[in-house]
Every structure is written in structure tokens, then in C-alpha cells.
From Swiss-Prot:
Subunit structure: Homodimer. Part of the ribosomal stalk of the 50S ribosomal subunit. Forms a multimeric L10(L12)X complex, where L10 forms an elongated spine to which 2 to 4 L12 dimers bind in a sequential fashion. Binds GTP-bound translation factors.
GO molecular function, one term: mRNA binding
Name of protein: Large ribosomal subunit protein bL12
Key word Lipid metabolism present: no
Function (record text): Forms part of the ribosomal stalk which helps the ribosome interact with GTP-bound translation factors. Is thus essential for accurate translation.
Low complexity bias (residue ranges): 117-126
Key words of the record: Ribonucleoprotein, Ribosomal protein
Alphabetized InterPro entries for the sequence: Ribosomal_bL12, Ribosomal_bL12_C, Ribosomal_bL12_C/ClpS-like, Ribosomal_bL12_oligo, Ribosomal_bL12_oligo_N_sf
């Protein structure tokens, strides 16, 4: 079995789309029975006492909530936003609700939301 260096793995992951990476993480979690999310207790311990002032978010996740009647236009919009292939974009749209973009800048997230809504989809920014 071939062994890959950390640099080779990072290079391979760098070429993947966010949707492909998300699918990989899910498969990794299932195969090795682990969870990629940080433990909740560690987050709670970081904020003792009074709640900190709420910061303005600078990264957003664009979530495709519902497709609507214009499925083909939504698939085209997803392809334009994510650079996914036709099959991957269709799978993402068919699996709604699903994230289309993750950790996107506010400007990019709002632009993607507008494109998807124009195509007939229902979209949330988280």
C-alpha cells in the first residue's frame, strides 16, 4: 500500500471542492468512527462568566434550503457558484437542504444567495 506524505495529502485536498471535502470528511468519520467537530465542553470553558459581545460574522455558509420549481436553473446556478460538474451539482440540489458554499466572505455569500434565489431556490446564510 502506498504511503502519502502530509504535503501530498494537503496538495490533493487543495484540489478538491468544498462539497467533495465535506463528503470525504463524512466518509472518514464513518470509517474510523470519529467526529471531526470540536468538543462542546472545550468551547464552553473558553467563555467563563458573562457572555462576550457578539462579533459581526465575516464568514458565512450558503445553505440551499429548497429547490423550488426551476430545478434545472438551480443546478446551473450551483455549477456556476461552485465549479462542480453536472452530476455533483445535481446531487447537491437533490440532497437539499445542503451547504453550497462554506466559510465564504459576506460579499461572496450574498452574491451566491442572490444567484440561487434568482434561479428559484430558497437559500439561507448561516
Amino acid at each position: 500500500m502506498a504511503k502519502f506524505t502530509q504535503d501530498e495529502l494537503l496538495e490533493a485536498f487543495g484540489e478538491m471542492t468544498l462539497v467533495e471535502l465535506s463528503d470525504f470528511v463524512k466518509a472518514f468519520e464513518e470509517k474510523f468512527d470519529v467526529e471531526a467537530a470540536a468538543p462542546v465542553a472545550a468551547v464552553a470553558a473558553a467563555a467563563p462568566g458573562a457572555a462576550p459581545a457578539e462579533e459581526e460574522k465575516d464568514e458565512f455558509t450558503v445553505v440551499l434550503s429548497a429547490v423550488g420549481d426551476k430545478k434545472i436553473q438551480v443546478i446551473k446556478a450551483v455549477r456556476a457558484i461552485t465549479n462542480l460538474g453536472l452530476a455533483e451539482a445535481k446531487a447537491l440540489v437533490d440532497g437539499a437542504p445542503k451547504p453550497v458554499l462554506e466559510n465564504a466572505k459576506k460579499e461572496d455569500a450574498e452574491k451566491a444567495k442572490a444567484q440561487l434565489e434568482e434561479a428559484g431556490a430558497t437559500v439561507e446564510l448561516k
